[in-house]
């Protein structure tokens, strides 16, 4: 099971060790969710100004947020699914605010790595179609997140 992850750190604040941990977390999540071999995802680390602009432009919310996910494989109601010849899926993009992650880690009383891992896994599950719009959806999604994080010792 291999997932290809492209990382871009626009903040120059994320260490190689932290990126490696996120890579392992997302590979574990992909394996647990039976993501096709060779699937691709990008993870970009940004500052609050950049994520605020993205949140405003794409969600109509003019405020910084912690993580945004942009799924590339979603089909609209009138779109037809075209099956490629064994083409691995491009799942989409995850954008994480490093200042927000640091702020939330301090507020929740856990490590920056735990918060960074949580946001990466949270964004990844959104790319796979999970949501938390209802209590039941939230229960399922958050249980999956906690399970994956616990496997790496990233508990609260």
From Swiss-Prot:
Positions that bind Zn(2+): 122, 126, 132
Source superkingdom: Bacteria
Localisation per UniProt entry: Cytoplasm
GO biological process: rRNA processing
Keywords in alphabetical order: Cytoplasm, Endonuclease, Hydrolase, Metal-binding, Nuclease, Ribosome biogenesis, rRNA processing, Zinc
GO molecular function: metalloendopeptidase activity; RNA endonuclease activity; zinc ion binding
Pfam families linked to this entry: YbeY
Bound cofactor: record note: Binds 1 zinc ion.
The protein's required cofactors: Zn(2+)
EC number: 3.1.-.-
GO CC terms: cytoplasm
Function comment: Single strand-specific metallo-endoribonuclease involved in late-stage 70S ribosome quality control and in maturation of the 3' terminus of the 16S rRNA.
Homology family: Belongs to the endoribonuclease YbeY family.
Protein name: Endoribonuclease YbeY
Organism: Geobacillus kaustophilus (strain HTA426)
Primary gene name: ybeY
């Amino acid at each position: 099971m291999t997932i290809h992850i492209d990382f871009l750190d626009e903040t120059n604040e994320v260490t190689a060790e932290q990126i490696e941990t996120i890579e392992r977390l997302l590979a574990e999540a992909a394996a647990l969710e039976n993501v096709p071999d060779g699937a691709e995802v990008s993870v970009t680390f940004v500052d609050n100004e950049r994520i605020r602009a993205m949140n405003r432009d794409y969600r109509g919310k003019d405020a910084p947020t912690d993580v945004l996910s942009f799924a590339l494989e979603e089909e609209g109601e009138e779109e037809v699914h075209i099956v490629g010849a064994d083409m691995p899926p491009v799942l989409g993009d995850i954008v994480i605010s490093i200042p927000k992650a640091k702020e939330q880690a301090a507020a929740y009383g856990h490590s920056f790595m735990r918060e960074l891992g949580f946001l990466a896994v949270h964004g990844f599950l959104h790319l796979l179609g999970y949501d938390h719009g209802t209590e039941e959806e939230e229960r399922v999604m958050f249980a999956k997140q906690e399970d994956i994080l616990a496997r790496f010792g990233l508990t609260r």
